[in-house]
A protein has these predicted regions:
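Hydrophobic, well-ordered secondary-structure elements that form the walls
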Residues: 434, 482, 724, 760, ...
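Generic detector of short, well-ordered, non-transmembrane alpha-helical segments enriched
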Residues: 377, 478, 606, 720, ...
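Short Cys/His-rich zinc-binding micro-motifs
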Residues: 807-826, 830
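Conserved P-loop NTPase motor core
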Residues: 1-562, 611-612, 633
Length: 831
């Protein structure tokens, strides 16, 4: 660990020295661009683009581009980036994370690397955590880019595909991380190439990068569809777990929050559901629902993890305190919470497409970020994203006072002390910002302040509409603001008139968060740009972090100090112990994210192959060669699977091949046993391929070219999409299933990789088979207009394929229906 830290420290010093030399070059060019007229300055953009086209690199033109952007910023918005902002911009350009304290001007810093990299005409994405910030920054900084002749857009959720495509084609795009990820998934579900909106992913600058790549790393983006009926099972599981007792029927690991049934709880489950063995393979769905019900009832808390609004369960973002409408806990946990809260259970849906931010952002050619707090997570950024954290010096020294924690025995005494401290500061007019980690604490303190007749603003997930306005006024004289976590992050708190003389903004933390980074973010709201400020955390031994990691040793320290319910103490020893506990939690969380990534990387490889195949079909105007090769591949697979270890096909196997080919691949002719018996394998393959392909070519020769092209493309995409959707769900179940392999001394991850690729290979074979069968069996309406086949895959299936079966051919009840529905014949046209 010490070696790793030394390596990081040495690298950071080396990089900063390099950046300072380049920054000096940028400042030396100041006079050159100051003297230019607006028209001359605006003409620099085309000159810089020409230098790139003539063979110079982005790094070659960097000093000039940065100097141009600085001068343009001054002329357009009246602000010229400081020297430290140029250092931050250099850190970003070279693919690092610039750690810049609150108020140091990250938004303006971003303009220089965004302008420089946009000159390549490959597009730059500036990523923010919400649409308010994306819109604000696009409008504010967009003035500078437009002055310099670049195009700028903001990517919003409600935009049409056409509007999104236009936005992505701009030089610089401001967007939320969620919208970028969802657009990527949607692009890989379209059935017409022109409906895709994204360009190749070139360069992303992520604002509040720790929030996006760390806090949200474990939350996958999911596009769902296709309802699965299981509401009753959730209700049954919920009723059962409500009969259980902690430690007797189930146990909770306080450190990891894992919850499991005891042997006694398992026996109760078997009696309750009247089954012999709860963990029998046939009851795997029931076990899953019981596990989710346990989590919902005993580890997920109303007003902390979620709120219930208008009969709906809405997620609360644990790191910002914001509501996340439209998002759902995955894997059935959302439905389990709905059962717990006795609200309508929304039908569980199948996952159509999914990706984590970890895998999405690693697809960019170059990735960088900026934040006020990333140093504590440097190892993770380095290992997973290959980014260093460069700590940028402040423009003015930080003079904020960070007091040692005040320790109390109980929450009750702690809250009384917080109210007393707020009252004392409020009486002299000093603004106070109170940070809480849960909505319930937020509302409790608000009610206590009301009783104390202290006027205040409250900001949490239930009251976020005025977020920016409330936070912006938090530095006014006499203001008191209570906010969950980092609500309002991205909005500066500027001090009102006369506040500096009162000591600046006072920040009070009501308890330590499990992440030091979140605590540092709260402290960082005070003391911006050399302003005075004060921060203080109040801690009790009833706080969650202390309960999870506190020890009797701490309590003995308190007893020795004579601490009782009426007193408090400041203890650097306990503060250090709290930070040690936080480091342990951070370590656990890092391990969990790394663990998730190891599993997601397996799916990532599958996704990469499938999306590449899908895009190849989409980008080809004519996929006839693809479908012919698919048919050939199926026939080769068929023959080789009937070949024994000596490379011989026995007569019995030849009979099976003949039966399969005649039943599934030929309509107007037959394969005879004599044509393949006692022949070489390659000759057998050739005979069958020639017969099948001849019949297919005969079938499509009368079709207009456009009809044939659209039909082949629609079927090819439909089969891939159906199987990919099933594969996602199969891999989810596999992941859940391998988790217990560790008890049998088998590495669950290795089992997941091995069995996952077996499933993937099987899926590719099935895609090959179904594509062939649908194309051979489907009868196409020859009077169909080409445009009717286009649209969604489902439309292509309904409009381009007649739901009729050729007379004279027997279709097995369990065979796939040749109409192209993807269902078995007995469940479709054979009803």
């Amino acid at each position: 660990m010490l070696g790793f830290l030394k390596k990081i420290f040495d690298h950071e010093n080396k990089e900063l020295k390099k950046f300072k030399l380049i920054a000096d070059e940028v400042f030396e060019l100041d006079d050159k661009y100051k003297k230019m007229t607006d028209k001359q300055l605006q003409g620099c953009t085309n000159k810089l683009k020409k230098r790139l086209k003539d063979g110079e690199t982005v790094d070659d033109i960097l000093p000039d581009a940065f100097a141009v952007a600085r001068e343009a910023a001054y002329r357009v918005i009246g602000e010229k980036p400081f020297y430290v902002q140029v250092l931050g911009a250099l850190a970003i350009h070279f693919g690092n994370i610039a750690e810049m304290k609150t108020g140091e001007g990250k938004t303006l810093t971003c303009v220089m690397p965004a302008y420089l990299n946009a000159l390549t005409e490959k597009g730059v994405h500036v990523v923010t955590v919400n649409e308010y910030l994306a819109t604000r920054d696009a409008e504010w900084m967009g003035q500078i880019y437009r002055f310099l002749g670049l195009t700028v857009a903001v990517n919003l959720r409600e935009m049409s595909s056409k509007e999104k495509k236009e936005a992505y084609n701009c030089d610089i795009l401001y967007s939320t991380n969620n919208e970028l990820g969802f657009d990527y998934l949607r692009d890989n579900m379209v059935v017409n190439a022109e409906d895709r909106v994204q360009r190749p992913l070139h360069f992303a600058i992520i604002d509040e990068v720790d929030s996006v790549l760390i806090d949200e790393a474990r939350t996958p983006l999911i596009i769902s569809g296709g309802v699965m009926k299981s509401a009753n099972l959730y209700k049954d599981a919920d009723r059962f777990v409500k009969t259980l007792r902690e430690n007797e029927d189930y146990t909770i690991d306080e450190k990891t929050k894992d919850i499991t049934l005891t042997d006694q709880g398992t026996e109760k489950g078997e009696k309750y559901f009247r089954i012999a063995n709860l963990y029998d393979i046939e009851h795997s769905a029931l076990v899953h629902h019981v596990n989710q019900a346990l989590k919902a009832n005993y580890t997920m808390h109303n007003d902390v993890d979620y709120v219930v609004q208008e009969g709906k369960v809405v997620i609360v973002d644990q790191f910002t305190g914001r509501l996340m409408p439209g998002r759902a806990f995955s894997d059935g946990l959302h439905q389990a919470i709905e059962a717990k809260e006795n609200v309508e259970i929304e039908e569980e849906t199948k996952t159509l497409a999914t990706i984590t931010f970890q895998n999405y952002f690693r697809m960019y050619e170059k990735l960088s970020g900026m934040t006020g707090t990333a140093k504590t997570e440097e190892e993770e950024f380095r290992n997973i994203y290959n980014m260093y954290v460069i700590e940028i010096p402040t423009n003015l020294p930080v003079i904020r006072v960070d007091a040692a924690d005040l320790i109390y025995s109980t929450k009750e005494e702690k809250y009384k002390a917080i109210i007393a401290e707020i009252k004392r500061r409020h009486e002299k007019g000093q603004p106070v910002l109170v940070g809480t980690i849960a909505i319930e604490t937020n509302e409790l303190l608000s009610s206590m302040l009301k009783k104390a007749h202290i006027k205040h603003e409250i900001l949490n997930a239930k009251n976020h509409a005025r977020e920016a306005e409330i936070i912006a006024k938090a530095g006014e004289k006499g203001s008191v603001t209570i906010a969950t976590n980092m609500a309002g992050r991205g909005t500066d708190i500027k001090l009102g008139e006369g506040v500096k003389e009162l000591g600046g903004l006072c920040v009070i933390g009501t308890e330590r968060h499990e992440s030091r980074r979140i605590d540092n973010q709260l402290r960082g709201r005070s003391g911006r740009q050399g302003d005075p400020g004060y921060s203080q955390f109040f801690v009790s031994f009833e706080d969650e972090l202390m309960v999870r990691f506190g020890t009797d040793r701490f309590k003995s320290i308190l007893e020795m100090a004579g601490l009782d319910s009426e007193r408090n103490m400041r203890s650097r020893t306990i503060t250090r112990s709290v930070e040690t506990a936080q480091k342990r939690v951070e370590g656990n969380n890092f391990d969990a994210r790394k663990h998730l990534l190891q599993y997601d990387d397996v799916m990532g490889k599958h996704r990469e192959i499938m999306y590449a195949r899908r895009n190849e079909i989409l980008d080809n105007e004519d996929v006839h060669n693809y479908v012919i090769n698919t048919m050939k591949e199926l026939i080769e697979l068929l023959v080789r699977r009937h070949t024994n270890e000596h490379g011989v096909i026995l007569e019995a196997d030849c009979n099976e091949i003949v039966e399969y080919v005649n039943e599934n691949l030929l309509n107007n002719s037959n394969l005879k046993l004599s044509e393949i018996l006692n022949k070489e394998i390659n000759d057998i393959i050739d005979v069958i391929q020639n017969k099948v392909l001849k019949e297919y070519e005969e079938k499509i020769k009368e079709l207009p070219d456009e009809i044939r092209k659209d039909f082949e493309k629609a079927i090819s995409l439909q089969v891939i999409d159906n199987y990919w959707m099933e594969h996602i769900n199969t891999m989810d179940h596999l992941r859940e299933g391998v988790s217990l392999r560790g008890y049998a001394n088998e590495d669950p991850l290795q089992a997941y990789i091995r069995e996952g690729f077996e499933l993937f290979d099987k899926m590719l074979d099935n895609i090959c088979k179904d594509t062939t069968l649908y194309l051979l069996k489907a009868e196409i309406r020859q009077n169909l207009q080409a445009k009717q086949v286009k649209g969604s895959t489902n439309e292509a299936k309904e409009q381009g394929v007649k739901k009729t079966i050729k007379k004279g051919k027997k279709i097995g009840r369990n065979d796939m229906c040749p109409c192209g529905s993807g269902k078995k014949y007995k469940q479709c046209c054979g009803k």
